[in-house]
A protein has these predicted regions:
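Transmembrane-helix boundary/entry motifs in multi-pass membrane transporters
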Residues: 1, 40-46, 75-93, 121-144, ...
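Membrane-embedded translocation segments of transport machinery
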Residues: 180-495, 519-521, 541-548
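Intracellular leaflet-associated regions of eukaryotic membrane-associated proteins
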Residues: 588-739
Length: 739
């Protein structure tokens, strides 16, 4: 079932792109993707930012507790791979081609193309360079790897120690028990396959354009266009398919070792060919700046820069509101004073940073990393059997971050150094108001040097990188190295290609395992199917818009949103699994959870002490429908049982039901009066809080472990099932009281 659901999503996406291109000369899907991306940034930046920080605090706490000594596997299990092979595999899987695409390009962008970016205090160009390196490390550091490690630890502890199949549904086994074997598990696995494929295709979309540029640089006859890139995708897919067919130890392990070694050689070469001490100084300084500012920037939601959008068509994109029920603030101001407002004017007036920084960079990155989490997390868990929780945190979280910092700092510093050298040689003036330069005045046109001075400087191997194409920048920084330049360009080509292959084969491998419900050796035709599906999705993403990258970014952010919630539950699941492994008293004394959970309508489970004559599926469905439109009956039954007071229970139920009816009425009238929708959702939140409080007391009476945050979330998302669930539990509270 999970394979079918995921296939419908992925091939449906491919079909939608093809139909859109066929029917419209100017395809509509890219606009829709961009609107979704903007909508998520406007409404859910806080969630992306906060969850990453909470996950990091949780994992850091685990490292210094007794749980760090628990093995991912039985107590006598030994690691299957050497430390170097293990690190090479997880790093090659976790990073992909992004290093080569962004290694030089991102620091240059933040240095000369990001406008008045204000993540750190900037008063001179040295601090601007420092901020550029920091912002790059921020996007590739702790917050990036944390989703991987949460999923990896959860799967490793639950599956390796409990002998469950290695599939994403079982990461939630400590929460919902054998519900993972039913439809709920199918949905989790289908979501994981879809997120994995979209996440991997984000990297493949970036990587294929990079490979195309390197080939064109080495051979001028190679065209840089979509046709060439389509061919590259399918050639790489063929190689990746062979790797998947060979399996984990013969195929993926060998390719990962080779890929990581190529990157290591390239890093050593640029270090010894350039000013070694400058690069080491830059690394040490960058780590210090990162440690100083990562907490403040890690909680930065761009609140005031995003507020500027309210002065520009009221959070609208292509004429559609991004905040439901909110009228345009700019329209009100214009009606009052006759003065037009805009986000651009607000940015200038209040000296704000660019509002697109969040959805264009930070939220894109968080969505990208999160969409990779089921894929990389499962892969790390798969190869980490026999290692302890503490060893995995150190080796699969801290170590790759440190290596990433070395690579990004070295290449980013070389890029900024070349930018400054070219600015000095061409006597380019920097506009201190937004730290930018005029490429045309500097002798560049169409990303190519055109003036005599710029051409002569390029012949010596130096370019104004901010005036160059993003794909060319990592090649440009190697241009000054004389006879080694071509060799290093070949290394870049090989490195990108094989990072592309390792990402593709690892993604197909994980999709294959999930769809086979954890089976170690699924049929070869199934492996080929997922590799082909991945390639088709990557091609669809690439062709969805002329720029390609904007659509790729949007899909990454959209795919990451639902999995953000899933990873939050992975933290709870991991915590419970670890406590049960050590048989902590507080958790062993309580019931496993609401066995009649919000999924009961689908899985037909019953309370653990319910007699054989349990309600039929028809009765349960009827109970859910009644709770959906008239929650009073279920709430009254549950509240009276939980509080052991008929009057108080009835009052609670009446107040909650009146709140629900008022919410529903305001919701129906939301299009009539301004602010009605806001009042409606405020009332709904009040109703949810009342349901959650009753659920909390029902759990306490039934000795069911959980927490109030989960009570709130369940009540908010599926209140009819929660009410029905409590109504079914209530009689057994009465039985215990009578006993």
């Amino acid at each position: 079932m999970s394979s079918l659901l995921a296939s419908l999503v992925l091939w449906g996406f491919v079909a939608a792109v093809l139909i859109d291109e066929e029917e419209h000369s100017n395809p509509k899907l890219p606009t829709e993707f961009s609107r979704w991306k903007k909508w998520i940034t406007v409404n859910f930046t806080w969630m992306y930012i906060l969850t990453q920080d909470v996950w990091f605090i949780f994992v850091l706490w685990l490292l210094f507790t007794k749980y760090a000594n628990i093995k991912l596997g039985k107590d006598d299990d030994k690691p299957e791979f050497s430390d170097f092979a293990w690190f090479s595999m997880l790093f090659s899987c976790g990073i992909g081609v992004g290093f080569y695409y962004y290694g030089v390009s991102e620091p240059i962008y933040h240095y000369r193309q990001s406008g008045n970016l204000q993540k750190l205090p900037v008063t001179n160009d040295d601090q601007k360079a420092q901020q550029a390196i920091f912002q790059t490390l921020f996007h590739w550091g702790l917050h990036g790897w944390i989703p991987y490690i949460v999923v990896a630890l959860t799967l490793g502890v639950v599956c390796h120690r409990q002998g469950l199949p290695m599939t994403m549904r079982n990461a939630f086994h400590p929460l919902i028990g054998d519900h993972t074997k039913g439809f709920a598990g199918d949905v989790i696995d289908a979501l994981s396959i879809s997120c994995t494929t979209f996440g991997v295709c984000t990297s493949l979309g970036l990587g294929v354009s990079q490979i195309n540029s390197v080939l064109a640089r080495l051979d001028g006859s190679v065209a840089v266009n979509q046709k060439t890139q389509t061919g590259i995708i399918w050639i790489i897919t063929a190689v990746a398919t062979c790797s998947v067919l060979l399996g984990l130890k013969r195929g993926i392990k060998s390719l990962s070792l080779f890929t990581f070694t190529i990157g290591l050689i390239l890093l050593v070469l640029v270090t010894v060919c350039d000013n070694t001490w400058f690069l080491i100084n830059s690394f040490v300084e960058a780590v210090g700046v990162y440690m100083t500012w990562v907490i403040q920037v890690g909680f930065n939601c761009g609140t005031w820069t995003q507020l500027n959008q309210e002065f520009d068509n009221g959070y609208e994109y292509e004429g559609k509101s991004l905040l439901w029920g909110k009228d345009s603030l700019s329209d009100k101001l214009f009606e009052a004073t006759g003065i037009e407002t805009s986000s651009a004017l607000a940015i200038e007036k209040y000296d704000s940073g660019p509002e697109w920084m969040m959805d264009g960079w930070t939220i894109f990155y968080w969505g990208w990393w999160i969409s990779w989490a089921p894929f990389v997390g499962m892969f790390i868990a798969k190869i980490s059997k026999g290692r302890t929780v503490g060893q995995v945190i150190k080796g699969a979280f801290i170590a790759p971050i440190l290596f990433s910092f070395i690579f990004l700092t070295f290449f980013g510093s070389l890029g900024i150094k070349m930018q400054r050298a070219a600015e000095m040689a061409l006597d380019v003036q920097v506009d201190k108001s937004n730290w930018s330069i005029d490429c045309a005045a500097a002798g560049y046109d169409g990303r190519t040097p055109t003036s005599d001075a710029a051409i002569a400087l390029a012949d010596k191997g130096y370019y104004l990188l901010s005036c160059r194409n993003s794909n060319d920048r990592i090649l440009d920084v190697m241009a000054p190295y004389g006879q080694l330049t071509t060799f290093m360009h070949l290394l870049v080509l090989v490195g990108i290609t094989f990072y592309f292959v390792t990402s593709s084969d690892s993604g197909s491998f994980v999709d294959d395992i999930i769809s086979a419900q954890g089976h170690e050796n699924p049929p070869w035709i199934q492996r080929v199917y997922w590799a082909v599906t991945e390639a088709a999705t990557a091609q669809a993403l690439l062709s969805a818009s002329e720029s390609g990258l904007s659509t790729i970014q949007a899909v990454s952010i959209v795919a990451g949103l639902p999995y953000t919630i899933a990873i939050c539950y992975c933290c709870t699941s991991l915590y419970r699994a670890l406590k049960r492994e050590l048989r902590d008293e507080d958790i062993m004394a309580q019931r496993h959870g609401f066995v009649v959970s919000s999924l009961d309508i689908l899985e037909l489970y019953s309370p653990e002490d319910m007699p054989a004559q349990s309600p039929s599926s028809g009765d349960r469905f009827k109970s859910n429908v009644i709770a959906l439109f008239f929650p009073y009956k279920g709430l009254k039954t549950a509240a009276i049982a939980a509080y052991n007071d008929d009057v108080m229970g009835t009052i609670y139920a009446v107040v909650a039901t009146c709140t629900w009816f008022t919410w529903f009425l305001c919701l129906c009238l939301s299009g009539i009066g301004e602010g009605t929708a806001s009042i409606a959702w405020m009332l709904y939140c009040f109703f949810v809080a009342q349901v959650a409080i009753i659920r909390f007391h029902v759990r306490a009476a039934r000795s069911i472990r959980d927490n109030f945050l989960n009570d709130l979330f369940a009540s908010f998302a599926v209140y009819p099932m929660v009410v029905s669930q409590m109504e079914l539990e209530a009689p057994y509270i009465e039985q215990r009281k009578q006993v």
